[in-house]
Design a protein with these regions (language model features):
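S-adenosyl-L-methionine
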Residues: 220-363, 370-374, 413-414, ...
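Short internal loop-to-helix segment that lines adenine-nucleotide cofactor pockets
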Residues: 248-270, 329-331, 345-400, 415-419
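Short, acidic, metal-binding catalytic loop of nucleotide-sugar glycosyltransferases
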Residues: 20-29, 310
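Conserved catalytic core of nucleotide-sugar-dependent glycosyltransferases
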Residues: 65-77, 93-182
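A conserved acidic beta->alpha catalytic loop
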Residues: 34-46, 325
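Short beta-strand-to-loop acidic/aromatic patch adjacent to the donor-nucleotide binding site
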Residues: 80-94, 379-381
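Active-site-proximal specificity loops/subdomain of glycosyltransferases
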Residues: 42-84
């Protein structure tokens, strides 16, 4: 019986679907999964499950040679002396006729061709992702070339076209000739289809199609889903902040130097004013845990999406509340001092005794710590657009008591009282000393405040 070989790399959910489809019309044929050094935990788990199936072999390799292992490697020289089928796992094989193997073998013998495989269906034009795919052309434009050179055959729809890994029957006893079979044997290449990509979570998309610099398909999908690479994590665009992520890798470098200075996998970090997550996502892989606090609903949505896409759910706790001098509710909205301020643009702020905004649940700093059982902190980062005025006393007392450093962004111009004198005694308990004049001279300044030991 003709053996099957499926190429695998961090996409085992597709491999599993392909195995199940093949077993529908070839239940007794041996299926070998050739895994090219998968690192994704879910994929490795699925591959382990597949090992328990009858007639399914899973080979785990320590290198990634792409799809060419069966065709080129010495270990498969005996395999190449007989017919075999090689395929990628990202095809929809669910509708193939039950006599597929018989028909492909018949066509191969009839037309004296060493490679006969399935054509890729591009008839659902509206469902295929738009944009540049390969050599500056779209998927439709690229794939159309394989549907032009029709072979005369009164039984089947055949085309002379190169083919290797799209469910291709290889038999090197025949002369070098490649044929794609259309009609009932044309199948979808799933990653090209919006309906398929949209059915996946952003996290699964990013994990499966993770290399847009090499893979034309991954590049196409990342553009469609608006996925960006930022430092050492992945971002899914919320459409509003694309420009920010475009400059992110050079944004506030001194802030990240502070994060790196205190980074430790034995302690956490409290991020008050987390916005869409530029600091949270960075620190999720550098600290034991991140508590992310923000009251902007739009920002929280973007943040939680990006926590999911990076699989940081167990590393980050999101607290969608404002932090204030008391617990309860407070008016919160667009920045009063910036005419172009809007939701989810990093400048939202608390309205102190001013009409406007939306009533938002808030916690005092002390209650924030207590209710969320926050402890063992290496650093506290605060950037809340003037709202630091309302939590300064509780924040500084906590820092002094626990000896926790604070990286505090002052927005003194936006303070209500413009009075720093009452904080001077606290400032003197920190290594930086009295920073009052520094804050007045530079109304928008971030200062590292380390308690004296």
């Amino acid at each position: 019986m003709i053996p099957f070989f499926i190429v695998s790399h961090n996409n085992a959910f597709l491999v599993k679907a392909t195995v199940n489809s093949i077993r529908r019309f070839a239940p007794y044929n041996v299926i070998t999964v050739l895994d090219n050094k998968s690192t994704d935990a879910d994929s490795l788990c699925i591959l382990n499950e597949l090992k328990s199936l009858d007639n399914v072999i899973v080979r785990l390799y320590n290198d990634n040679t792409g799809p060419w292992r069966v065709i080129r490697e010495q270990e498969f020289c005996n395999v190449r002396t007989k017919p075999f089928i090689l395929t990628d796992p990202d095809l929809d094989l669910t509708k193939l006729p039950l006599n597929t193997l018989e028909i492909l073998t018949k066509i191969q013998h009839k037309h004296n061709a060493n490679k006969v495989g399935l054509a890729l269906d591009i008839s659902q034009v509206d469902d295929i992702i738009k944009g540049t795919y390969n050599h500056d052309v779209t998927v439709i434009q690229w794939e159309s070339q394989f549907w032009t050179n029709k072979i005369v055959d009164h039984e089947y729809e055949l085309y002379s076209a190169e083919i290797d890994t799209t469910f291709c029957l290889h038999n090197y006893s025949y002369p070098s000739r490649s044929i794609r079979v259309g009609g009932d044997f044309a199948v979808k290449h799933l990653p090209w289809h919006m309906s398929f990509i949209d059915s996946l979570t952003a996290n699964l998309v990013a994990r499966t199609f993770y290399n847009p610099t090499i893979s034309t398909t991954s590049k196409l999908i990342w553009k469609y889903k608006k996925i960006f690479k930022a430092k050492d994590f992945i971002v899914v665009s919320d459409n509003q902040n694309d420009a920010f992520w475009g400059i992110y890798n050079g944004w506030e470098t001194e802030t990240f130097q502070v994060f790196d200075r205190f980074a430790t996998m034995s302690q956490g970090i409290l991020d008050i004013g987390s916005w869409i997550g530029p600091t949270v996502l960075y620190n999720a892989s550098r600290y034991k845990h991140v508590w992310a606090v923000d009251a902007d609903k739009g920002a929280i949505k973007s943040l939680t999406d990006n926590i999911e896409v990076n699989n940081f759910q167990n590393k980050v706790t999101v607290i969608p509340k404002a932090v204030y001098h008391r617990s309860g509710s407070v008016s919160f909205g667009n920045n009063l001092f910036l005419a172009n301020s809007r939701e989810n643009d990093s400048t939202s702020q608390i309205y102190e005794n001013i009409e406007g905004g939306k009533m938002t649940e808030c916690l005092s700093f002390d209650d924030l710590i207590k209710e969320n059982k926050i402890d063992n902190l290496a650093l506290i980062k605060v950037d809340i657009e003037g709202g630091e005025e309302f939590i300064m006393e509780q924040l500084l007392k906590y820092s002094m008591r626990t000896k926790t450093p604070i990286y505090l962004s002052f927005h003194f111009t936006w303070w209500k009282t413009k009075d720093l004198t009452k904080y001077v005694p606290y400032f003197l308990e920190f290594v930086c000393g009295d920073v009052s004049e520094q804050i007045k001279l530079h109304p928008f300044i971030s200062i590292l405040m380390q308690p004296k030991y």
